[in-house]
Amino acid sequence: MISFLEVEWLKTRRSLIRWIVFLSPIIISGCAVSYLIYRKDISNYTIYQSFFSIWSACIIPIGVGIITGYLIYEENLSNSFNIILSNGINRKKFYLAKFLFSIIAQAVCTFLAVIILCLGMNVLNSNNLEIALFLKASLFSIIGTLPIMAIHLIISFIFGMGASIGAGICGFLVATFIGTTAIGDNIWMFIPWSYPVKMSMIPYILQMNNTELLAQIQSQINLLFLLSIILSAIFLIVGVIWYNNCEIRDNRGD
């Protein structure tokens, strides 16, 4: 599997993926720091909540759509799928490598954005943001990303990059309303795109040490973790089984 991941990394050389992963967090967090350093009245909690609401509900769904879609689009451009068929390359490992590489790319992008935000605010504005707390929230949001990454990979293989990006935009709209407002209090568990923003808020709640509040939402926290793992496993298994038995479709026109 390591060799498959190394190949995936080499394929992204001089591609859009590396620009997305390494440049977008610099731009987004840089803009956030540029705005926040002049707002002395904003609390650390507001910074935390605002950043992860925007990042997890907006950036992640669209980013997942672009990353998974573009990875498959590049394979179509290079005719790699026909090479896989003719050379007998392990399809299961190939599919899993795409999934793992997508997760790693999203994780690097998220952690980089958080580190830039925290360092920028701590150096330029003396906010004393807890980097450990923000990194923990990033990890939780990435766990919440697993199901939608598995879903988008299936969409990308079957329908192409355009459909994956379109689904990401729809996911962003749904996550914004369902994941960040009271509208989705009773239906968020049916919307995987809301999981990242819900998961990212857990570390702050845990740090509050409010036993009464924690007791009220402990079941939701457990459900979030359970759904993230189970749904990602289900969609990943479905994707692997489908890809292992399918005829490759040409999506170069998408």
Feature map (PLM): residue ranges:
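Residue-level recognition of membrane-helix boundary sites in multi-pass small-molecule transporters
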Residues: 16, 20, 93, 98, ...
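Secretory targeting signals
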Residues: 24, 28-63, 68, 97-161, ...
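Terminal transmembrane helical anchor/hairpin motif
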Residues: 41, 46, 171-250
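Transmembrane alpha-helical segments in integral membrane proteins
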Residues: 66-71, 76, 153-156, 161, ...
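Helix-loop-helix units of permease transmembrane domains in multi-pass membrane transporters
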Residues: 70-104
